[in-house]
Amino acid sequence: MEEVESARNEDADEERSNEVKNSRRKRMPLFGKKKFDEKITKKYVFHEVLGTVDHPNIIRLWEIFDNKTHLYLVMDLVKGGELFDRIVEKGNYTEKDASDLIRQILSAVDYLHDKGIVHRDLKPENLLYYSPDEDSKIMISDFGLSKTEDDDSMMATACGTPGYVAPEVLRQKPYGKAVDCWALGVICYILLCGYPPFYDESDANLFAQIMRGEYEFDSPYWDDISESAQHFITCLLQVDPKKRYNCKQALDHPWISGGAARERDIHASVSEQMKKNFYKAKWKQAFNATAAMNRLKNLKLGADSARASESNNNAKKI
């Protein structure tokens, strides 16, 4: 009897799998169970994060089902491509377009934050257009690093993607929702000039720039960008998370809600810089910030030791 019931369940799984595969409305990532702890995945991804989310700018998880070998996540099917790819392909692109994009993303992140969810890995590769239509909405995807935040708790696990990670994460301090707002500041900066505010081939130098909040609005790339846009970015890229704008403050900024964004075409400059700067693998890879910071500590300890040794040698010579 158990074998018959098992066979029926497997047939149902196969039927459901084929049904979803043939659906135009949904996509279905599948994962081998050896790579996933099924119970944790269902509890964490479905119930604690994606299972509670319903927003027009967030890819929705509709259901989870499994068979003996695989776990299936039934999600929205988005076919419009990645954010930067679409911008590069456009014939016209303005500051107002960037403002509209950021407004949609802010609305979604504000919704997540109100539900106690921190994305923790906001970056252009996780921002997808819903359809190829010119007026398609933007969607937030990839909640692999997302975490729910209790009212009285702060997170401490260092994670993210190097160029978008907030200073408090690199300092290995407890952090909260403000890390998403920092990442949005980085994304907004890139949308308006085509290159990142913080960059260096050396991780140590990159992290040092971020922790100091060291960036510029360089000429000529920012000459045609409004002061309102620059002020908006400055409000998000505050090193002190207590001084950083939250989503609601950002949504109320004149550049987002007050019509301050310019409508001059900046496509040529922005798309050229995007093509130059964003085919670099290191900007597309998530990283373990704890391991990275440990490497930096070792480098610092080594440098301090070398300086101490040099100082001792000089003292002996004297």
Question: What positions do the PLM features span?
Answer:
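Intrinsically disordered, low-complexity regulatory segments that flank or precede the catalytic domain
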Residues: 1-41, 313-318
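C-terminal regulatory tails of eukaryotic serine/threonine kinases
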Residues: 5-19, 231, 248-314
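A short, aromatic-enriched beta-strand patch in the conserved N-lobe beta-sheet
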Residues: 63-64
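Conserved short submotifs of the Hanks-type protein kinase catalytic core
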Residues: 69-82
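Activation segment signature within eukaryotic-like protein kinase domains
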Residues: 101-102
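Conserved catalytic-loop aspartate of Hanks-type protein kinases
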Residues: 180
